[in-house]
Amino acid sequence: MSDNRSTYPNISTSVFSIEQEMNFTQLNIRFDPTDISILPIFNGVMDLNLDIAPNTVSKHSGNFALWLGPDERLVLVANDKILDLAQRLERELNGRHYSFIEVSSGQVIFDLKGKEVRNVISKGCSVDLHHKYFNIGQCVQTAIDKINVICFPIEENHIRIIVRTSYARALIGWFKDACLEFI
């Protein structure tokens, strides 16, 4: 499993910061949504609810499941739990139609924090990120300055963003420019 040791420059101001989050392994999970018995197996093995509504996030024991589509979830699992989890999934799901692929080397997770985090992101994002509309427990696939990302709030002033590795440096550069007015 990849641990994505590539580092990116951090940004830190009094009202906005961004740093890479490296404590998770990312699993893309696909399954047959018509097989009503498969999600309870995933849920039991992962100790995480994957049977979630569109554009929502499930969290348990520090792990996250993000709804990406009717048959797709992105799961963030603590790095030290991934090997046991993969073995248990293979054993319990034997003979079923599913896939789980470790995608950590292809995507980077950034934690954005600060009282202006939503304002900085909204400068390049068409989704309304106001607290009234985008709350903890929700996720969205969108674009920031034409770069595809997945966003989800962890706390009121803490948003986690997942971006493809090949666009991570461009996104950091965009955030450097976007946060200037808030310094």
Can you name each region flagged by the protein language model?
Residues M1-I183:
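Basic, glycine/lysine-rich polyanion-binding surfaces/domains
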